[in-house]
Amino acid sequence: MRKMNLIVAMDAEGGIGKNGVLPWRIKKDMQYFASVTKNVSDQSKRNAVLMGRKCWESIPVTRRPLAGRLNIVLSRQLPAQKSDDYIVVNSLEAAMKLLSEPPFVDSIETIWNIGGAEIYDLALRENLVDEIHLTRIFKNFEADVHLKSLDFSKMEKVQNAEVSSENSEIFEENGLKFEFCKWKVVENH
């Protein structure tokens, strides 16, 4: 089965959401998210973004589906749908099966899991994650959704070429300090 990358912004306490939206507004993080999830080395391919229904519904209608990527929504409530840029499936297993077969096995370069917490947890539990691209925000936002399943003892921090030659650069925007980190899941740890 194919592996995926996970991309997430998280506060100091592991919070990733509050009242159905991101509890912070960091333009540089949004730009990073778009750049990383769209970037392909083979220009004949594109990436897929995999998300849960709540994550899908948190995206403004005018920005759905996320441009330049195949959007796959996991939902037990939405009816199954399929178009060129948007597919609804009822399970992670169904999504991964779809992406592991033609035409997607040949046309999708990277699968990006963009959340939310339940979808992140499921992929981590099923050992489907290769890399984690983490925006670490150095503040607690009293979030109501947390990512609890990240076990950094089973990962190693790697160079994040998408940001700079330094993997530990701290940025600041709107009074918030944050960094972009990249972690590789170590299989036999």
From Swiss-Prot:
One of its GO terms (biological process) is folic acid metabolic process. The keyword Transferase does not apply. Belongs to the dihydrofolate reductase family. The gene is dhfr-1. One of its GO terms (cellular component) is mitochondrion. Substrate binds at D29, M30, Q31, Y32, F33, A34, R69. Keywords: NADP, One-carbon metabolism, Oxidoreductase. GO terms for molecular function: dihydrofolate reductase activity; NADP binding. It comes from the Eukaryota. This is Putative dihydrofolate reductase. Key enzyme in folate metabolism. Catalyzes an essential reaction for de novo glycine and purine synthesis, and for DNA precursor synthesis. It catalyses: (6S)-5,6,7,8-tetrahydrofolate + NADP(+) = 7,8-dihydrofolate + NADPH + H(+). CDD domains: DHFR. Its EC number is 1.5.1.3.
